Amino acid sequence: NNILTIFYAGGNKLYADSITVLKLTKVINDVLTRYKVKSNTFVLGGYSAGGMIALRYVELCNEFPAKFPIQPKGVFTVDSPIDIFSIYEQLEESARNNYSELAVEEAVRAMGYIKEDHGVPRENISTYAKLTAFSMNKDYCQNEMFLKNMAVRTYHDVDIAWRIVNRNQTVHGSNYEVIAELINRLVLMGNDRAEFMQSFQTGYRSNGQRHPHSWSIVNEVEFMQWMKGLLK
């Protein structure tokens, strides 16, 4: 397809803090210098937390164009948690309910990563409002305004039964509940290129394990056609 693909490893970061933004900018500057590509021919995206980081980075590119090296054409997320405030509340609920041992372990670990950085989000709203890509609570921030004119795609395997059986969680514990609100707000702003890409039972890990939180939920052929259309 003649498309240069760059992978960036963000470690355990769940959002685009100043260090992550700086590192990603360095990678992009290196790409611009090394491969002589145009600064307006980038599509950013990521899986899980990588999607949160990509989404926030694109927002920052649009909010502060003079401070960032590229003008992205589009952004995509793959079952990404994008609202740090909602994420933390969902994690607290999972740990408190104790419905699933695995869900509790995941929740405690993720809450630890968050608290180590800037504490509990609702107790430090001003800081986390600058880090999160989106907030269900408009009083916290409305960073989605910087995606108003951007092509945005979010991918999800909407298998509610799997969540109930394997995690004892409902739709409320899903990433797509929050993402649907993001896409709806963008559509209400007049963005006809904001798309919620829904599939069903498409998620499988590389070892064949059924899991809706997987890269495989993206239709690769159709995705490439979408991206090539943006880069024309």
Where are these regions (language model features)?
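C-terminal catalytic histidine-bearing segment of alpha/beta-hydrolase fold enzymes
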Residues: 152-162, 174-232
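Short, solvent-exposed loop/turn and secondary-structure capping segments
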Residues: 17-20, 56, 86-90, 165-167, ...
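Conserved alpha/beta-hydrolase
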Residues: 1-15
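Mobile cap/lid helix-loop segments that gate and shape the active-site cleft of serine hydrolases
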Residues: 88-145
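Short, proline-enriched alpha-helix->beta-strand connector loops that line the catalytic pocket
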Residues: 71, 145-153
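Primarily recognizes the serine-hydrolase "nucleophile elbow" in alpha/beta-hydrolase
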Residues: 33-34, 39-98
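Solvent-exposed loop/turn segments at secondary-structure junctions
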Residues: 11-15, 48-52, 80-85, 135, ...
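Alpha/beta-hydrolase active-site loop
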Residues: 15-36, 56
